[in-house]
Amino acid sequence: MWPLSHRHLCLAFLLVCVLSAISFFLHVHQDSFRHGLGLSLLCPDRRLVTHPVAIFCLPGTPMSPNTSSPCPQHPASLSGTWTIYPDGRFGNQMGQYATLLALAQLNARQAFILPAMHAALAPVFRITLPVLAPEVDSHTPWRELRLHDWMSEEYADLEDPFLKLSGFPCSWTFFHHLREQIRSEFTLHDHLREEAQSVLRRLRLGRPWDRPRTFVGVHVRRGDYLQVMPQRWKGVVGNSAYLREAMDWFRARHEAPVFVVTSNGMEWCRENIDTSKGDVMFAGDGQEASPWKDFALLTQCNHTIMTIGTFGFWAAYLAGGDTVYLANFTLPDSEFLKIFKPEAAFLPEWVGINADLSPLWTLAEP
């Protein structure tokens, strides 16, 4: 028997390595398809992207309850790539997210959000829409469509496979038929929900009698709206008279309610909201840079009083129960009414209380 040379030993070793690698690849390949490995390519056209981006979803793999899913829910039944430009503050981006989800489903398209929207919403909610990589966004042949703030027939028949929406949609007419899905998307992470409920428990224990409480979340929008509404839109924000009437509405219908006040103007609230009945609690921190604590608190209440703005809308929409809102808060000739339809903004069952427009008449006097 001839002794093996050093060269023969090297060749034999390489052959064993190659065969082992092939065997391993075949094993993984078979196992992956046996368990239904899903592949969703985010690239609309491989020729447009140097490095294709892919998301791998293992069906049945449990997700952490406090993280957002990176995978589409039904990638096989949807096509195309739709997204929306994230613009505005917290409530604006919630409206954009919900509208994108609803319109994409209506048109059988796959929805993706951009990283900025994910950064704004994912720390607060268990959102599930996948994130579109920046390099894919920059190479996609988008058609752009600016939405107005109510559902229109043409939005139900959009044939564009690659569509980037924009605007400030926040109307129930887009997504109310998916209310339970929207509520699921905007489920708070556990630590935020538990913190909010802890605040409400302390309010309950602070009462001199031991019985279940009815909590009414109150959101008072102030801040930049104090200038924007009268100067640009010929409108007003909610005043103390409105808040008193709204609270009396709940006092007449619910036994001993507790009003949980949040605002980006807490100092004004403490100075102007009547607390003589002992049922008003100033619980908000008013931090506009981190609004999720106030938002979580409002959603854990039973009912809502809102003034104006998308933040209050979403708090009321997610809380459920009764909602009282500020109605007719602009003059009839306001330009705001060209971009805002009250009947599309407020649910039909919500209760509107007319705003006091007398400060605007004073401003209009020569």
From Swiss-Prot:
Q: What is this protein called?
A: Galactoside alpha-(1,2)-fucosyltransferase 1
The enzyme's first-digit EC class, named in words, is: transferase
Keyword Ribonucleoprotein applies: no
Task: Give the gene that encodes this protein.
Answer: FUT1
What protein family does this chain belong to?
Belongs to the glycosyltransferase 11 family.
> What does this chain do?
Catalyzes the transfer of L-fucose, from a guanosine diphosphate-beta-L-fucose, to the terminal galactose residue of glycoconjugates through an alpha(1,2) linkage leading to H antigen synthesis that is an intermediate substrate in the synthesis of ABO blood group antigens. H antigen is essential for maturation of the glomerular layer of the main olfactory bulb, in cell migration and early cell-cell contacts during tumor associated angiogenesis. Preferentially fucosylates soluble lactose and to a lesser extent fucosylates glycolipids gangliosides GA1 and GM1a.
Transmembrane region positions? 9-25
Record topology, Cytoplasmic segments: 1-8
- Please give an example of a GO cellular component term from this record: Golgi cisterna membrane
Q: Name one GO biological process term.
A: olfactory bulb development
Q: In which pathway does it act?
A: Protein modification; protein glycosylation
Q: Which domain of life is it from?
A: Eukaryota
Positions annotated with a glycan in the UniProt record: N66, N302, N328
What the entry lists under InterPro entries is as follows: Glyco_trans_11 (IPR002516)
User: How does it sit in the bilayer?
Assistant: Single-pass type II membrane protein
Give the main location.
Golgi
Query: What EC number(s) does its UniProt record assign?
Result: 2.4.1.69, 2.4.1.344
Q: Which residues lie on this side of the membrane: Lumenal?
A: 26-366
Molecular function as annotated in GO:
alpha-(1,2)-fucosyltransferase activity; galactoside 2-alpha-L-fucosyltransferase activity
User: Known PANTHER family for this protein?
Assistant: GALACTOSIDE 2-L-FUCOSYLTRANSFERASE (PTHR11927), GALACTOSIDE ALPHA-(1,2)-FUCOSYLTRANSFERASE 1 (PTHR11927:SF4)
Keywords from UniProt, A to Z, are: Glycoprotein, Glycosyltransferase, Golgi apparatus, Lipid metabolism, Membrane, Signal-anchor, Transferase, Transmembrane, Transmembrane helix
The top of its lineage is:
Eukaryota, Metazoa, Chordata, Craniata, Vertebrata
Recorded catalytic activity of this chain's protein: a beta-D-galactosyl-(1->4)-N-acetyl-beta-D-glucosaminyl derivative + GDP-beta-L-fucose = an alpha-L-Fuc-(1->2)-beta-D-Gal-(1->4)-beta-D-GlcNAc derivative + GDP + H(+); a ganglioside GA1 + GDP-beta-L-fucose = a ganglioside Fuc-GA1 + GDP + H(+); a beta-D-Gal-(1->3)-beta-D-GlcNAc-(1->3)-beta-D-Gal-(1->4)-beta-D-Glc-(1<->1')-Cer(d18:1(4E)) + GDP-beta-L-fucose = alpha-L-fucosyl-(1->2)- beta-D-galactosyl-(1->3)-N-acetyl-beta-D-glucosaminyl-(1->3)-beta-D-galactosyl-(1->4)-beta-D-glucosyl-(1<->1')-N-acylsphing-4-enine + GDP + H(+); a neolactoside nLc4Cer(d18:1(4E)) + GDP-beta-L-fucose = a neolactoside IV(2)-alpha-Fuc-nLc4Cer(d18:1(4E)) + GDP + H(+)
State where the protein is found: Golgi apparatus, Golgi stack membrane
